């Protein structure tokens, strides 16, 4: 053994003695080669994320205009974690959580931990305590803009508090990032949009809370309404685009299109139908949709209703979509015919 190797071994032993076993290791020893994920609750978004869902132990920022579907996207993630037997927490800084709507999206509100903090410091300290416990699988902070520093709440209306929230977020993320990674917690920060004053060229839109969250986030999702969905003259929902603006675990800039139906959340049938039509798993002839020579319905809404009433066929189509994109989370449905294959 060379003197250099002996010196390195001695240094490694001292580091492990001082900071504990596993504090330093060779990258290939115990590091996870494949990113561990939890489904987002939307097949289209799972594909856009490139790894089949939200990566564990990472920070995710979801931002967009008002009523675009940010909280809906987050609640679907909570429902998926709970479906897998995980524990979820929701820091409701906006004090606007609707338990009835959350329940309709599949969230078990009896098991969901909810906090409605008075100040930004309180909300972030509660989040840190939950993450450090190691018992939380997903935590959602709604929203960064509502994490108001204590000094601002206790001050007068006209007082100036320049950069106070940005400093608060910067300090909190420095403390949180390591704990989030070690505990394998998915931390979702919901954020709003503001406009910079006096911007003549380029995008005037920005997100509050400073730049720290942009840097610490593994994934940043931009949620925007694209168009209204109508049934006759009645507006029943919105077609929403979710753009992956930043992604450290897969190629970014992919876009997921989902139907967010009022009172129901993301329409699983709508995205499955659209994706299956693109891949020619479901054949579209005129206004008719067909699968394995079986007609699903005339028009998109009727075909969606057919898939809703026939979950076996819906799950079978979803399996082939996942298989095509290489993000197989679902196993093949038991009643799937062996002859059914994806070309």
Swiss-Prot record:
GO terms for cellular component: cytosol. It is found in: Cytoplasm. It comes from the Bacteria. Keywords: ATP-binding, Cytoplasm, DNA damage, DNA recombination, DNA repair, DNA-binding, Nucleotide-binding, SOS response. GO terms for molecular function: ATP binding; ATP hydrolysis activity; ATP-dependent DNA damage sensor activity; damaged DNA binding; single-stranded DNA binding. Its main location: cytoplasm. PANTHER family: MITOCHONDRIAL DNA REPAIR PROTEIN RECA HOMOLOG-RELATED, RECA. This is Protein RecA.
């Amino acid at each position: 053994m060379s003197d250099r190797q002996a010196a390195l071994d001695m240094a490694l032993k001292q580091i492990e003695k001082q900071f504990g076993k596993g504090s330093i290791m060779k990258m290939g020893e115990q590091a996870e080669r494949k990113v561990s994920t939890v489904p987002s609750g939307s097949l289209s978004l799972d594909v856009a994320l490139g790894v089949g869902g939200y990566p564990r132990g990472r920070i995710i920022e979801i931002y967009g205009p008002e009523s675009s579907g940010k909280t809906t996207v987050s609640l679907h993630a909570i429902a998926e974690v709970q479906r897998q037997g995980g524990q979820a927490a929701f820091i409701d800084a906006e004090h606007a959580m609707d338990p009835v709507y959350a329940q309709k999206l599949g969230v078990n509100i009896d098991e969901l931990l909810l906090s409605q903090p008075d100040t930004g410091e309180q909300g972030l300290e509660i989040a840190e305590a939950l993450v450090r416990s190691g018992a939380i699988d997903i935590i959602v902070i709604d929203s960064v803009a509502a994490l108001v520093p204590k000094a601002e709440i206790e001050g007068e209306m006209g007082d100036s508090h320049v950069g106070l929230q940005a400093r608060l977020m910067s300090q909190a993320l420095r403390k949180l990032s390591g704990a989030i990674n070690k505990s394998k917690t998915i931390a979702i920060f919901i954020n709003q949009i503001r406009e910079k004053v006096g911007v003549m060229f380029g995008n005037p839109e920005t997100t509050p809370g400073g730049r720290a969250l942009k840097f610490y986030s593994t994934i940043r999702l931009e949620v925007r309404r694209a168009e209204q969905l109508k049934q006759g003259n009645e507006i029943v929902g919105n077609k929403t685009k979710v753009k992956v603006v930043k992604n450290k675990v897969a190629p970014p800039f992919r876009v997921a299109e989902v139907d967010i139906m009022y009172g129901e959340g993301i329409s699983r049938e709508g995205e499955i139908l659209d994706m299956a039509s693109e891949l020619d798993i479901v054949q579209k002839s005129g206004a008719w949709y067909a699968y394995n020579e079986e007609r699903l319905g005339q028009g998109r809404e009727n075909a969606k209703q057919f898939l809703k009433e026939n979950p076996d066929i819906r799950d079978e189509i979803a399996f082939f979509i996942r298989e095509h994109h290489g993000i197989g989370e679902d196993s093949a449905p038991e009643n799937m015919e062996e002859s059914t294959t994806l070309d």
